[in-house]
């Protein structure tokens, strides 16, 4: 652990430009990434050194609002990076970017702290095991299965269901998961963070003591928030704070950790806000020139080692639904599986609005998932692709002009499309339909039967918003009885 200097290195604020603060020192300059401390309106304010400007001045990024700072105000060099509490005491707590509790439940009595910037694990320490993480969501498990210890990206524009999907994954995986979970809320809505916290309390993921108060003992999740209303410094670093907590559970306790990030785009966005203030020349579409470096520094630390694993699920906002935008495009290279949410599918009322032809996974290989699963997934995609290519003909000439074979393909594809929808546990309060968890074996068996035409006699409506194929048969009987 880095020791603080015996005599404190004190500087003074020379200028404040929004979230960026310049500090002048008479003696030695603090190192890049060092944390400096001052007070603002009676609160502790942390500044992170980003640049040495020369003439005894450093340029820093503020981790909180800078309103109220004045020139000449004293700033102290802590002699080390921003450090956050790590370990079991963080479980069941909500922390901010600098590791302070924001749940009004007193201090985090952690015995250890860790710096938020760290090197990625060495290649020799990384694990290469390939196994599937079952989510219970049909479209994901069948067509783009997730890797245990892998990186998963949920791509989607505004309002197509990224946060609901990430909450369902937390519900299906984290609640039944033996290890620990860490949730990093990066630049998203405070309301969603609040809802998530109460959901965790209700589900028992955050434990309560005899008086009904939340307690770290028995809790399985740590929450780290830097929400939309926070300055860019906090949003640019909060993902690293969350990751540092997850790394402790992986490296020291040897656990399999789930790391949820909502939203990685806000991490990039905060970096671009700060970048211009730091005097860097913007690159494509106004993003920071260090976009790939920033993303790489974060993503390379999220990995599985011989000690334990971190499986990360990251929501990634796609500006204007354009996947070629530099922010989502830079994320693609780091991911093992991508789940693309499509507005056109959500407009059909099919939820989750996952695009079955655009979502990919390196796990969809016969040697990992088995021959039957692989062939079923490819047959489903082939049927949907044929339907997609016939849509123009249908739009211009109508269904009657198609050959009998093509008509059958279209009917099956429409059933598959509806069968890929699924009621979610977290959406139960809005839809009134009970959520469903479908085992991967049932998913493969059901879709194989549909593709092979075993259920051609059932109506399309029976396939919508159900779990397994047994429910389809049940729903078809109900519909027939209602129509009679």
Curated annotation (Swiss-Prot):
Keywords: ATP synthesis, ATP-binding, Cell inner membrane, Cell membrane, CF(1), Hydrogen ion transport, Ion transport, Membrane, Nucleotide-binding, Translocase, Transport. ATP binds at residues 156-163. It catalyses: ATP + H2O + 4 H(+)(in) = ADP + phosphate + 5 H(+)(out). Pfam families: ATP-synt_ab, ATP-synt_ab_N, ATP-synt_VA_C. One of its GO terms (cellular component) is plasma membrane. It is a peripheral membrane protein. GO terms for molecular function: ATP binding; ATP hydrolysis activity; proton-transporting ATP synthase activity, rotational mechanism. It is an enzyme of class 7 (translocase). It comes from the Bacteria. Its EC number is 7.1.2.2. InterPro entries: AAA+_ATPase, ATP-synt_VA_C, ATP_synth_F1_bsu, ATPase_a/bsu_AS, ATPase_alpha/beta_chains, ATPase_F1/V1/A1_a/bsu_N, ATPase_F1/V1/A1_a/bsu_N_sf, ATPase_F1/V1/A1_a/bsu_nucl-bd. It is found in: Cell inner membrane. Belongs to the ATPase alpha/beta chains family. F-type ATPases have 2 components, CF(1) - the catalytic core - and CF(0) - the membrane proton channel. CF(1) has five subunits: alpha(3), beta(3), gamma(1), delta(1), epsilon(1). CF(0) has three main subunits: a(1), b(2) and c(9-12). The alpha and beta chains form an alternating ring which encloses part of the gamma chain. CF(1) is attached to CF(0) by a central stalk formed by the gamma and epsilon chains, while a peripheral stalk is formed by the delta and b chains. Produces ATP from ADP in the presence of a proton gradient across the membrane. The catalytic sites are hosted primarily by the beta subunits. This is ATP synthase subunit beta. It comes from Rhizorhabdus wittichii (strain DSM 6014 / CCUG 31198 / JCM 15750 / NBRC 105917 / EY 4224 / RW1). The gene is atpD.
